A protein has these predicted regions:
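Glycine-rich beta-strand-turn "strand-cap" elements at beta-sheet edges
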Residues: 2, 9, 40-49, 72-100
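A short, mixed-charge helix-start or loop-turn motif at secondary-structure junctions
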Residues: 8-9, 56
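Short, surface-exposed ligand-recognition loops at beta-strand->loop->(often short) alpha-helix junctions
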Residues: 9-22
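Short, charged/polar surface micro-motifs in flexible loops or helix N-caps
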Residues: 12, 47-48, 58-63
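Intrinsically disordered, low-complexity segments enriched in polar/charged residues with Gly/Pro
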Residues: 14-16, 27-29, 41-44, 65
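An amphipathic, aromatic/His-enriched active-site/gating alpha helix that lines ligand/cofactor pockets
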Residues: 24, 29-37, 56-89
Length: 100
């Protein structure tokens, strides 16, 4: 399994709006992507404008395909709520309670 970790900084006062957009407009896009497994969105308890999204994919190739073909549209949808460009990092899942 493969994970994309996307770190967002919302515009001041836009964190709730950002989370609502992710849930209402982006979750449906994620669900139809080949290899998509799950999306978890975290809101910082100490930095009010920070949101981190973890998307889980069956393979690195499927995540990369999403990154090339769909992610540019996702960034456009979120642009009005963001203070800066999101930072994307990728990881291999090496341990998980759901995989054992």
């Amino acid at each position: 399994m493969f994970v994309r970790v996307v770190d967002f900084v919302s515009r001041p006062g836009k964190t709730r709006s950002l989370n609502e957009i992710i849930q209402s407009r982006l979750f449906p896009i994620f669900r139809v992507q080949p290899g998509f497994v799950d999306e978890i969105v975290l809101e910082s308890d100490v930095e009010p404008n920070r949101v981190v999204a973890l998307s889980f994919w069956n393979t690195r190739e499927q995540a990369e395909r999403y990154n090339q073909e769909t992610y540019p549209t996702v960034k456009e949808v979120l642009a009005a709520s963001l203070e800066a460009d999101p930072v994307v990092r990728t990881f291999n899942v090496v341990n998980s309670t759901t995989l054992t």
